[in-house]
Amino acid sequence: IDGVLVGGKAADGNLFKKNATYGVKDDSAYIAIANTSGLPQTLIKNPLYTSTYGMGEQIKQALNLGKKNIYLFLGGSSTNDCGAGMLAALGCKFFDENGEQFIPVGGTLGKIASIDDAEMRKSIEGVRFTALCDVKNPLLGKNGCSYVFAPQKGAKGDDLSTLEENMRLFYEKTKYLRVDQNFDGAGAAGGTG
């Protein structure tokens, strides 16, 4: 690519701030989820509690640099949050049934009662995103990310069915986007695909 590395503070999978880098060249940014929410960077390994928020922070940094093409490398994550943390970092607001705003993780995706994505949509207007992954797993089902990859990230026993159900509820809550979200590769990086 022949670009340069830039960076700043971004959250790891446990939402602890750390230094993290990503690549830039011309009007493009190249961001790997493994640099923020990767398994090696995450101290407490359990996808019920890990977040993609740091990747969203890096995207926001790239947007502030004027980057209009964002390439997301989705491999090696510690997460199973459907990218909700990333969306929250970009300005998407998630509310529970009491109207309290929160940042969803794999264990709380099912608690989302409403979503306000207006601020996020405005922040990414005119930006092209390309997600790159090396898996073909869908979001849901026995071949989906919860059952196939969550055990590698620290999930055990009933965690798998909890993660799957929360992911299904998130899928239902985001159908207003009118986009099929259960395609091959959607399960990459804990549903961030």
Segments (PLM) and residue ranges:
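N-terminal loops that bind phosphate or other acidic moieties
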Residues: 1-74, 78-193
